[in-house]
Design a protein with these regions (language model features):
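Polyanionic/metal-chelating signatures
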Residues: 1-108
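Short acidic active-site motifs
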Residues: 73, 93, 119-120, 151, ...
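His/Asp/Glu-enriched, well-ordered alpha-helical/loop segment
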Residues: 83, 125, 129-138, 142-217
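Catalytic beta/alpha-barrel core
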Residues: 85-90, 107-116, 136-141
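Active-site environment of divalent metal-dependent phosphoester hydrolases
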Residues: 91-95, 114-121, 171-172
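Feature captures the catalytic cores and cofactor-binding loops of soluble hydro-lyases/lyases
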Residues: 98, 117-132
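A generic structural motif
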Residues: 108-116, 120-121, 190-198
Length: 217
């Protein structure tokens, strides 16, 4: 797995008097950073493919491309060998990153927090992304003002694999209560609500063959 991030967390990392010339400063800048790095990774992969296609005698006369651990990681993403979980809130940014992923040929595994997921649930289903969201957090910063307690149920109704997360050590002890809010607000069945804190997180982590559910015997 690898974690990416969108929104104010990314922009504010470069905020301050001495950091005003750094990129990204805008959401458009964040998008460009993603494209720049993935395009570099694609070119890096092609360099290695070209080198590896040489015969042994040709390799002895040719300098190998420089090993770049950052590009190796991005190539793994492009080749669907590494899963992405992405911090997100706003629908425009969620759409943007799915567009980047679609254009580069990979799939986003999970959007975390994703409090505007209900606005793009159909697009997430089409793309193949899952959701790990808060039950009813809202308005703790400007970009989450549109959060609603029906988010998890709407995502689940659209066929998105949906989990409820805590982001808090104390709340993690009471995820059953967080799941119950999906029953209260979204009319989700108790079984589906339990899946949001058991089986569905296991699916998003690709561990559902080992944890997340129980069977007779």
């Amino acid at each position: 797995f690898i974690k990416l991030a969108l929104g104010e967390n990314v922009k504010q990392a470069n905020r301050g008097y001495y950091e005003r010339i750094r990129c990204p400063q805008t959401r458009m800048g964040v998008e460009q950073v993603f494209y720049d790095h993935f395009l570099r990774a694609r070119a890096y992969e092609q360099e290695w493919e070209k080198y590896n296609s040489l015969s042994l005698s040709e390799k002895r006369k040719t300098q190998a491309p420089r090993e770049d651990l950052e590009m190796n990681t991005l190539v793994e993403i492009l080749n669907k060998e590494r899963f992405i979980t992405c911090h997100s809130y706003v629908q425009s940014e969620i759409n943007m990153l799915m567009h980047v992923a679609d254009s580069m040929g990979f799939t986003l595994n999970t959007f975390t927090h994703i409090l505007e997921g209900y606005k793009v649930a159909d697009k997430m289903k089409t793309h193949g992304a899952g959701a790990s969201t808060f039950s009813d957090w809202w308005a703790y910063k400007f970009e989450v003002n549109d959060a609603i307690p029906y988010n998890a149920s709407i995502l689940a109704d659209m066929g998105v694999v949906t989990a409820i997360n805590s982001d808090d050590a104390e709340m993690a002890r009471r995820l059953n209560q967080e799941a119950a809010k999906a029953v209260k607000y979204g009319n989700v069945s108790e079984e589906e609500a339990w899946k949001m804190v058991t089986l569905n997180p296991a699916k998003l982590l690709h561990l559902d063959d080992r944890v997340g559910s129980i069977k007779s015997g």
